[in-house]
Design a protein with these regions (language model features):
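A general structural signal for well-ordered alpha-helical segments in protein cores
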Residues: 21, 25, 50, 84, ...
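Conserved, mostly hydrophobic/aromatic
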Residues: 28, 57, 87, 125, ...
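Catalytic alpha/beta core domains of metabolic enzymes, predominantly
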Residues: 89-90, 101-202, 206-209
Length: 266
């Protein structure tokens, strides 16, 4: 693991009060103790709120920011860029952009990316659109913005196109499997082994993306690992017994299969 993101989508930032979010930044900084970089999400509808979170993150000792498009507002490419640049001016920290049109309704388009080239702080992008053509475009046209996989079932393709980071919620409870795929593809360049590992991971990815149960699955995955992450924030509800059984079975099978592929115990 090379870093920890606080207040991302999986962290349920959208269901927390401002006070809770700022407390979480500071608490995570205390626990991480500079062992790995801490990146803090600034997501909010209002630019002013995102700026406030960015400044609080810097005060907490964050090493970088995660900057997404404002939800619901449906801003243009120019407006997204102005939003991100305002956050950048306020905090002056390295920033990973977060493109997630499935939740935010808009893409960070070429106009956005071109305008953000005004600041060297925009050094990476977590691409979660699911559109493989955007992966091609980012790798080809914006090589100065490091490509990070934000769509788990496309991890192999991201690595093939040069991505050297993967922001993956499943790694919270199954780090060994995710690291095995990352190591095989991004470090060793062994895509033959990577395809085998990816094939073993796809059932888990299908369970996580079954619709409306992503956060609940992550939290229960942590419970299976002996970590109490608490219930999901309302309106979300915990998994039912059958969902829990299915998740546990899929994780067990995945770990056993990947262990056989890599020769390392999980």
């Amino acid at each position: 693991m090379h870093g920890i993101i606080v207040a991302g989508s999986t962290g349920e930032y959208y269901a927390q009060t401002d006070k809770e979010r700022i407390w979480m930044m500071n608490r995570c900084a205390e626990l991480i103790k500079n062992r790995v970089p801490m990146i803090v999400g600034t997501g909010a509808i209002r630019t002013e709120d995102s700026i406030g979170f960015a400044q609080a993150a810097k005060a907490a000792g964050a090493n970088g920011l995660l900057i997404s498009t404002p939800p619901y507002a449906y801003p243009t490419g120019r407006e997204i860029a102005l939003h991100a640049l305002a956050i950048d001016r306020a905090a002056n920290l390295p920033a990973m952009l977060y493109n997630y049109p499935g939740r935010m309704s808009v893409n960070m388009d070429a106009e956005t990316l071109d305008r953000l080239g005004r600041s060297p702080n925009f050094c990476a992008i977590k691409e979660s659109s699911g559109d493989i053509n955007r992966v091609h475009m980012l790798a080809r046209d914006y090589p100065h913005i490091a490509l990070s996989c934000g769509m788990d079932d496309q991890a192999l393709e991201f690595f093939a196109w040069g991505a050297r980071s993967w922001v993956c919620a499943g790694s919270n409870f199954a780090p060994e499997a995710h690291i095995a795929l990352y190591r095989s593809c991004a470090i060793e360049g062994d895509f033959a082994k990577g395809r085998k590992i990816m094939s073993a991971m796809l059932p888990l990815m299908s369970v996580l993306e079954q619709g409306g149960k992503f956060v609940q699955c992550i939290k229960h995955g942590l419970t299976l690992r002996g970590i109490d992450a608490g219930p999901p924030r309302k309106p979300l509800q915990p998994l039912n017994k059958e969902d829990k059984r299915q998740l546990a079975e899929v994780i067990h099978t995945m770990n056993k299969t990947i262990s056989n592929i890599t020769g390392e115990a999980i």
